[in-house]
Amino acid sequence: MPGNPLPDAEQLLKALTDQMRPEVGPETGLIGIHTGGAWIAERLHRDLKLKVPLGTLDVSFYRDDYEKIGLHRDVKTSSIPFEIEGRHLVLVDDVLYTGRTIRAAMNELFDYGRPASIRLAALVDRGGRELPVAARFVGATITLAANQNIELIRDSNGRLELVASKD
């Protein structure tokens, strides 16, 4: 996007880690939303030295708008290899936009049990909420037009990068 370069994803990840470190204990459950959120969660899990195994969610079947926005049911496996009942959780996503992905993720989480709390970490908050969802931990807040999209990609070396496109 000319005149509005996207922030460096690696720097945002470091900022996110620094925000989370004082508030996230080793017994906190960390769950990444496929695909970009899972990549971020992998790095956060390692850097925060969490003891609880990393969890991942694919919310494809829990979304209420997949037909409207053209989501393909390229389903990945959801895996939560720990008990969530009564546990403090951090749900991780790459880009927070309408809030619908987060709503879907919370619906799926409650199928696994009743956590003590759920906090949200997002690499980027781009505004545009349709549901009352807010992240506790945010790498950066940016403003994009409704016809602009932002996506997290990962190269073969594991380096993360934000890329923009238009509808």
Give the residues covered by each predicted segment.
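PRPP-associated nucleotide enzymes
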Residues: M1-D167
